[in-house]
Regions:
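Acidic-basic catalytic patches of nuclease active cores, encompassing PD-(D/E)XK
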Residues: 420-453
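Domain-level recognition of nuclease-like catalytic cores that cleave nucleotide substrates
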Residues: 504, 510-535
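Active-site metal-binding core of divalent-cation-utilizing nuclease and nuclease-like domains
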Residues: 143-150, 449-474
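Metal-dependent nuclease catalytic cores in nucleic-acid-processing enzymes
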Residues: 184-189, 194, 340-348, 440-445, ...
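Phosphate-binding site recognition
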Residues: 1-431
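Mg2+/Mn2+-dependent nuclease catalytic core
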Residues: 172, 176-178, 485-502
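Structural motif
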Residues: 155, 477-481, 513
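Conserved catalytic cores of phosphodiester-cleaving nucleases, focusing on short active-site segments
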Residues: 439, 464-468, 477-487, 499
Length: 535
């Protein structure tokens, strides 16, 4: 049974036979258009457990001439494509799982390259005994020898190509050796019909150049027309929820949040499948991601990083410049590098429709995408001294919301007084925006299941700072929160009334709590007034 050359189709068959299978075969049509062209090199990066390996197995089964796989694809969407039959089972496919090879070589890159090369050449010799191999220790020459005789081009599928880049990130010699080996296989080789690599990180840069600059890259910051294949689309998730009798709104709350210009809703596929199979919603992230990695990155001493993390946990968006990220896990010069890495790892998601003015090319508005990832952030800050004030405030979230519902304005003010007096001050108060972040943070946990939050909502003659609208079937009052800095809580309440902020609620029937909060810079205390309004 071959390990590399024209592997058997049984791995993809296992996916097809699973109790949940989502048809992502239209991806093949995109690749077919580029076979044997200058655009034949693809590198797609996305987080762990986002379906990279399943896609690789699908491509192997489709392109490989080792077996007739028409029975697997005739009922899939790709079968309707004009290119379907033209490329089905027409190529010699080389499949390499770099993660497995790296482990097998005990993390020795030189040994890994030697082992993979000799193993593939051995399989080539068995498949083509008539071929004379001039330099069997050089993989690219062996491939060319086979192609010159068979005239059958190769499709390369490389899964987890960046494992070496991540594990050997401080071993420059090993990285150079690995990249040069890949470059030799791919660059300007006529035997390549298609090359498809998957990983978590985009291709490593050296200065302004990359050893693999022939590849077209598609990542979590720029997936282009591959966006629907990063995870499950909204339509796919709705269909699964209908089939398996799962609550779609909860599925959306827990696993949605990855957004792109033409595909506004992408869900974490592994977590969707796990939630359906276990019939419950929760975080399945720690089962697949390195928990310590998030701890390490948010703990870094980068100017402004801590404040941005606090804002993100509070449900706000921050701006990230991804242009100078070096596509590794060690080169961190600014907070932008750390936050960009968190995008590629799936901890943060870009928001192309944000109200924040960015170009969505090198600068993006990002946020924590869903409840699953919010839970991971909350778990991380719980035991982190740098964020102890943050966790203390989050832990009081339910009591705070109950105090607001009970019109207990003194208790509400006291919560924020204590938070501000904490020696690990959550944020430096310098304006109403800072105060807004702390309020959002304090209510983030308790309002997840009960409210939809809107920030700086246009209402009447101005903008309300924070509006919390009850979710469907939640019998609780709406909250309209106005914030002041060095003024008074009464001024905040007066502004709500004078500028007719309640006009926003004209289609809402029920009670609204008007919450005015002021922070006095001189006394370092908060004042709060809560009033009822009936719509």
């Amino acid at each position: 049974m071959p390990k590399y050359l024209n592997k058997e189709k049984n791995l993809f068959q296992e996916s097809l036979d699973s109790f949940i299978y989502v048809d992502k075969s239209p991806l093949i049509e995109i690749l077919n258009k580029c076979i044997k062209t200058k655009q034949k090199y693809f590198c797609l990066s996305r987080p762990r457990r986002f379906g990279k390996s399943v896609t690789a197995q699908m491509l192997c089964s489709y392109y490989s001439r080792g077996e007739d796989s028409s029975s697997q694809f005739d009922s899939l969407k790709i079968a309707k494509s004009p290119s379907y039959k033209k490329h089905l089972n027409q190529y010699n496919v080389i499949f390499i799982n770099m993660s497995l090879e790296f482990n097998s070589a005990r993390h020795d890159v030189n040994q890994m390259i030697s082992s993979v090369t000799s193993s593939i050449v051995k399989e080539l010799k068995e498949a083509y005994p008539q071929v004379v191999f001039n330099s069997p220790d050089k993989l690219y020459e062996a491939l060319d020898d086979v192609f010159s005789v068979s005239k059958v081009p190769f499709v390369f599928i490389v899964d987890e190509w960046d494992r070496i880049m991540r594990e050997k990130n401080e071993d420059a010699q090993s990285l150079k050796l690995y990249l040069e080996w890949l470059e030799g296989i791919f660059k300007d080789q006529s035997y390549i019909a298609l090359a498809y690599m998957t990983g978590i990180l985009p291709i490593k840069k050296y200065g302004n150049q990359s050893a693999l600059n022939m590849f077209n890259e598609f990542s979590m910051t720029d997936p282009d027309n591959f966006a629907p294949f990063i995870g499950f689309t909204e339509r796919e998730v709705q269909s699964l929820c209908n089939e398996f009798k799962m609550n779609f709104n909860q599925m959306q709350q827990w696993y949605d949040g990855y957004s792109f210009t033409d595909v506004p809703h992408i869900y974490n596929p592994n977590s969707v499948v796990k939630s359906i199979s276990r019939k419950r919603f929760g975080s399945y992230w720690t089962k697949t991601e390195t928990f310590e990695s998030l701890q390490e990155y948010i703990d870094m001493n980068m100017e402004g990083l801590r404040d941005d993390i606090v804002k993100l946990i509070a449900g706000e968006e921050v701006v990230v410049n991804v242009a100078k990220f070096q596509n590794d896990m060690v080169t961190f010069k600014t907070k932008n590098d750390v936050l960009t890495l968190l995008i590629h790892l799936g901890y943060l998601a870009i928001k192309p429709d944000s109200d924040i003015r960015v170009d969505n090319i090198s600068k993006f508005a990002v946020h924590i995408p869903n409840e699953e990832i919010k839970m991971e952030f909350r778990n991380i800050v719980e035991d982190n001294e740098k964020y102890s004030g943050v966790y203390n405030l989050i832990s009081k979230s339910y009591d705070l919301l109950n105090d607001i519902w009970s019109l207990n304005s003194d208790a509400v003010a006291k919560v924020f007084d204590e938070a501000h007096q904490d020696h690990t001050s959550i944020l430096t108060y310098n304006d109403e925006n800072s105060l807004s972040c702390v309020i959002s943070l304090s209510l983030e946990l308790s309002t997840t299941d009960t409210y939809n939050v809107v920030r700086e909502l246009p209402t009447g003659k101005g903008y309300a700072d924070l509006v919390y609208l009850p979710k469907p079937d939640v019998n609780k009052p709406a909250l309209l929160i106005e914030l002041k800095f060095d003024k008074s809580a009464q001024t905040a309440i007066n502004q709500i009334k004078e500028k007719n902020y309640l006009q926003f609620f004209k289609d809402y029937k029920g009670e609204v709590l008007l919450v005015g909060i002021n922070y006095s810079k001189d006394t370092k205390t908060h004042q709060c007034i809560i009033e009822k309004a009936q719509i």
